[in-house]
Amino acid sequence: MNILGLIVEYNPFHNGHIYHLSKSIEKTNATHTVAIMSGNFLQRGEPALFDKYTRAKIAVENGVDLVIELPTLFACQSAEIFSHGAITILNSLNCINSICFGSEEGNTEILYNIAEILANEPNKFKLLLKKYLDDGLLFPTARANALFDYIHQDKKNNFIQNYSKEQLSKTLNSSNNILGIEYIKNLIHLNSSIKPFTISRVQSEYNSEEIESDICSATAIRTSLKENTDLFHLKNVIPEKTYNILNEKIDNGFLPMFDDFFFDILKTIILRDMDTLKEYFEVNEGIENRIYKDIFTSEFLHELQLAIKSKRYTLTKIKRTLNNILLGIKKSDMQLIKNIDTIPYIRILAFNDKGREILKEIKNKSEIKIINKFSNISFSLDDTIFKTLISYDIKATNIYNSIYYKNNKDLVKGPMDFYTHPIYVK
């Protein structure tokens, strides 16, 4: 058994994901695939278009064998924390042979050598970084300059000696390269036997909002869905199984979810918790004062985000910060989990027969607990990390479903994490 690990959001699963899946299997000679997938809220600090079970089912229908939920506390954070959670899960399974991710760079060796320097932080590199930061450069620019200087001083790293500062900076700051470097850094920190691979992203940029071919970015699809929920205009850019499942959800009253839908809930929390806003993760440096001031004059969430945005606070950073407030994510809880080197449990969202084979392998090779639904938990809840992780997953699901099920309230019998089974795809 040769098991490939994938780290995904599938928001939604489109033709580019089919390409990534097939090329990853081809590159690694994998016989089985496991996807670690974000739940109902995502790394950009926004809700998923459709619920985690629907997205997991679509993934398995399109060729993934097993989908495991990435806990909310990891799923909604920076690339560093997001990657740490996903890689820690894969490493804790003790049966994953490789990971494969898309990147703008497309060269595993280059990304690995960059990650190795950033993971080990040699003294020369740290001194160079400090110098550029002391010169007043922003961290991304300072890091690129320090890395460029270090590489040209260290003869071992001739793999990118010909890169200019601009090329290196672009490599370091491209969306998928950032995640890929963080994946590899975490593999190094964990001394993992999992082998990293990458494939080049094709045609569409990660953040592109244009639909120009049959492979486009998820961003472009989300932008299109926000303007028109009729899926017919997306038929050429998503697989048939994705199209059919999402069409059925929409026909049954489950509309795509966007962050503005949660603005009233967020506004209530901000007005109620003004005195304690700084307890939420990423609420630092007095930003709570700007949030409180601008909440009164903002009619929509996007309006609030843009009002707070500045050179110091990027839009993505603002979105994550506000999402942390929405989900009640506290600094103290993030401190508890952000450096753990094992995960106490995995939550299964969907699987097929080959996924069953993977689960059997996990049971044979790992002590990790496997959860199908929270009502079936039969082991001790004394584990603080375990309790912290699942409590936020439950909160996130409940908050998400309060809007997602507004046209289907009769289907909600209580906290759905307690009674929803993993989806088996024959």
UniProtKB/Swiss-Prot annotation:
Protein name: tRNA(Met) cytidine acetate ligase
Species of provenance: Clostridioides difficile (strain 630) (Peptoclostridium difficile)
InterPro entries hit by this protein: Rossmann-like_a/b/a_fold (IPR014729), tRNA(Met)_cyd_acetate_ligase (IPR008513)
GO biological process: tRNA modification
Record-linked Pfam families: HIGH_NTase1
Recorded name of the encoding gene: tmcAL
Residues involved in ATP binding: 7-20, 102, 176, 201
Similarity field: Belongs to the TmcAL family.
Keywords: ATP-binding, Cytoplasm, Ligase, Nucleotide-binding, RNA-binding, tRNA processing, tRNA-binding
Keyword Repressor among UniProt keywords: no
Coiled-coil segments on the chain, per record: none
One Gene Ontology term, aspect cellular component: cytoplasm
Subcellular location(s) of the protein: Cytoplasm
GO molecular function, one term: tRNA binding
HAMAP family, sorted: TmcAL (MF_01539)
Free-text function comment from the UniProt entry: Catalyzes the formation of N(4)-acetylcytidine (ac(4)C) at the wobble position of elongator tRNA(Met), using acetate and ATP as substrates. First activates an acetate ion to form acetyladenylate (Ac-AMP) and then transfers the acetyl group to tRNA to form ac(4)C34.
Catalyzed reactions per annotation: cytidine(34) in elongator tRNA(Met) + acetate + ATP = N(4)-acetylcytidine(34) in elongator tRNA(Met) + AMP + diphosphate
EC number in record: 6.3.4.-
Residues passing through the membrane, by range: none
